[in-house]
């Protein structure tokens, strides 16, 4: 017990000294790289936190290059995900050289009237730039304020979303819209708020009490979602 006490005291002393000398301690989800780069080797069967590194001698400029951000994600291709329900298509920017660099990116296309519904990235902040069209874009602050911070963005506008906060976009115009989103994690994660509550196999009475409604209403809304079975 005495040893634990001395260790804790030493830790507190080090933190105090660091603060006194203006040292900033940063805690991140993605670890710092230990080499100049670690180009992902998708053929490797090794499983690590990230992807194994390609032989540096075999690395080329193409490993740090992606062509296609200027093309609609609706064109499909590798890394494309479409949602008819919400009217958007997202395509990840596939750059093997981003492996271990704590970053990822995607192009998102939203049809007129479409939305990217309220969602959050548990492991990343986001910066989005509008490539075409106009969207209502913003985020919601944490409880208890639940303040909406949002505005209409047009081509060339940039908006930042803090890590872990619920955010959304709505193309309420008559033209298609497109955005380029960069995230501060190689694996930012994506949680759709409505799907997490209504598509997950949660007890119906729990969902009803959460939404301050009755079970019949929950069942009616759930019929519009794909209910995942555990």
UniProtKB/Swiss-Prot annotation:
Signal peptide (from-to): 1-20
Cysteines paired by S-S bonds: 38-53
Residues noted as binding Mn(2+) in the record, renumbered to the chain: 119, 121, 126, 167
Hydrolase as UniProt keyword: no
Localisation: Secreted, Extracellular space, Apoplast
Alphabetized Pfam families for the sequence: Cupin_1
Chief place where the protein resides: secreted
A GO CC term assigned to this protein in UniProt: apoplast
Gene Ontology molecular function, alphabetical: manganese ion binding
Residue ranges constituting the Cupin type-1 domain according to the UniProt record: 86-219
Alphabetically ordered keywords of this record: Apoplast, Disulfide bond, Glycoprotein, Manganese, Metal-binding, Secreted, Signal
Matches recorded under InterPro entries: Cupin_1 (IPR006045), Germin (IPR001929), RmlC-like_jellyroll (IPR014710), RmlC_Cupin_sf (IPR011051)
Record function comment: May play a role in plant defense. Probably has no oxalate oxidase activity even if the active site is conserved.
Protein family: Belongs to the germin family.
Subunit: Oligomer (believed to be a pentamer but probably hexamer).
Protein name (record): Germin-like protein 5-1
């Amino acid at each position: 017990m005495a040893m634990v006490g001395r260790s804790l005291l030493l830790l507190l002393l080090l933190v105090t000294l660091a603060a006194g000398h203006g040292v900033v301690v940063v805690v991140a989800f993605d670890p710092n790289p230990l080499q100049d780069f670690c180009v992902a080797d998708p053929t490797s069967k090794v499983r690590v936190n990230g992807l194994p590194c390609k032989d540096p001698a075999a690395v080329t400029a193409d490993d740090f290059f992606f062509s296609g951000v200027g093309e609609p994600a609706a064109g499909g291709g590798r890394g494309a995900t479409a949602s008819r329900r919400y009217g958007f298509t997202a395509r990840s920017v596939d750059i093997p050289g981003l492996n271990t660099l704590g970053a990822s990116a995607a192009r998102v296309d939203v049809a007129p009237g479409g939305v990217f519904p309220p969602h959050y990235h548990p492991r990343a902040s986001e910066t989005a730039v509008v490539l075409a069209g106009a969207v209502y874009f913003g985020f919601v602050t944490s409880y208890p304020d639940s303040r909406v911070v949002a505005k209409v963005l047009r081509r060339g506008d940039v908006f930042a979303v803090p890590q872990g906060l619920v955010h959304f976009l709505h193309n309420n115009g008559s033209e298609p819209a497109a955005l380029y989103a960069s995230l501060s994690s190689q694996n930012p994660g994506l949680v759709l708020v409505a799907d997490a509550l209504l598509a997950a196999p949660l007890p119906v009475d729990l969902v009803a009490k959460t939404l301050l409604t009755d079970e019949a209403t929950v069942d009616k809304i759930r019929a519009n979602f794909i209910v995942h079975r555990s």
